[in-house]
């Protein structure tokens, strides 16, 4: 007498993405054989998918090489998905973050708010002396030469979406200082970066901007960590962060520049001045991209020490962003 199991099913998803379901009724003694058979099939599909992906990334690197041929700039790229890193290009280089570090600042501020149960609508008092001149600050234009109050929600929107430098430095002080922020990000198991300067500090000398740096993969990993992990017990804080990133007004010609019009991109840009020789320290963009099928990837694109025009720098980022988008699909 043979004892039978219930219907034995296995769903296979080959690299094509189309699934197929096998169902059969088997004697118990044959189940282990069938398991081994199906595991072998799954392993084969996994190996094929891995080889295909590796070929795609190799082709992508070659296309990036061709794009950058003759360009007077150092470019770094990293792409991460929920399965890990997919692409690293010049990942050994320490790229100056510029205003991209405002994302790090926001995470530390939200961590404090979460731990102390502080509302996004809490009021912050700002002194006129905190609105420094000679720096990019839409907030100062709105409140010229006066003390004022503002919610934390609005202050963070100014810092991230509008890349306001004064708002950023106020948030750095609120979070506990730049060293505290640096230590907090390291506690998230993110290495290969350093933060030691405020926005005002970065404006103190041309060399100072290089002190806030990151490798591309460290930045992409931080984006993934902030999105996939529950860093805050209050879900509203995470939702607010990513909506603010999606609402970013700067750098529309960078990561988003050549993507389909309705593509959802939550990103933070960074840009520097030029030195006397016309060299631009950095043009950056880093963020999350959501594909039409709901899959996500995290990308950091850094352009350093560039003698190309601002338009060319943005075009480099936009074209690489589109290459990655097409490869991910």
Predicted regions and their residues:
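Bacterial Sec-dependent N-terminal signal peptides
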Residues: 1-8, 12-57
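Active-site SXXK
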Residues: 96-126, 159, 299
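Mid-domain, small-residue-enriched loop/turn segments at the edges of structured enzyme/sensor domains
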Residues: 74, 169-229
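Structured C-terminal helix/loop/strand segments within mature extracytoplasmic catalytic/sensor domains
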Residues: 21, 56-65, 173-174, 178-179, ...
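Flexible glycine/proline-enriched surface loops and loop-helix/loop-strand junctions
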Residues: 89-91, 151-155, 162-168, 199-207, ...
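Beta-lactamase-like hydrolase cores
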Residues: 55-96, 273
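Short, well-structured active-site flanking segments
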Residues: 111-131, 178, 182, 234-238
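Conserved catalytic neighborhood of penicillin-recognizing serine enzymes
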Residues: 131-169
């Amino acid at each position: 007498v043979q004892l039978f199991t219930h219907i034995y099913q296995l769903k296979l998803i080959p690299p094509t993405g189309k699934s197929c379901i096998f169902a059969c009724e088997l004697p118990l003694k044959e189940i282990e054989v069938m398991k081994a058979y199906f595991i072998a099939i799954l392993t084969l599909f996994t190996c094929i998918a891995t080889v295909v992906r590796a070929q795609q990334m190799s082709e992508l690197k070659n296309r990036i090489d061709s794009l950058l041929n003759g360009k007077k700039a150092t470019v770094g790229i990293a792409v991460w998905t929920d399965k890990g890193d997919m692409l690293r290009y010049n990942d050994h280089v320490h790229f100056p973050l510029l205003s991209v570090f405002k994302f790090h600042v926001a995470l530390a501020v939200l961590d404090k708010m979460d731990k102390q149960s502080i509302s996004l609508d809490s009021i912050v008092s700002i002194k006129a002396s905190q609105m420094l001149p000679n720096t990019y600050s839409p907030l100062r234009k709105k409140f010229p030469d006066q003390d004022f109050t503002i919610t934390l929600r609005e202050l963070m929107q100014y810092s991230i979406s509008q890349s306001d430098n004064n708002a950023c430095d106020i948030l750095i002080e609120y979070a506990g200082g730049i060293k505290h922020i640096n230590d907090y990000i390291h506690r998230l198991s993110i290495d290969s970066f350093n933060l030691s300067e405020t926005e005002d500090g970065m404006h103190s000398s041309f060399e100072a901007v290089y002190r806030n740096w990151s490798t591309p993969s460290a930045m992409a990993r931080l984006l993934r960590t902030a999105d996939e992990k529950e860093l805050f017990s209050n879900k509203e804080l995470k939702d607010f962060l990513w909506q603010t990133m999606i609402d970013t007004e700067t750098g529309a010609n960078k990561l988003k520049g050549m993507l389909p019009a309705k593509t959802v991109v939550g990103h933070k840009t960074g840009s520097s001045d030029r030195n006397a020789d016309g060299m631009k320290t950095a043009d950056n963009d880093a963020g999350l991209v959501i594909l039409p099928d709901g899959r996500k990837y995290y990308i950091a694109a850094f352009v350093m020490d560039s003698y190309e025009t601002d338009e060319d720098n943005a075009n480099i980022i936009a074209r690489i962003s589109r290459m990655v988008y097409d490869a991910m699909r």
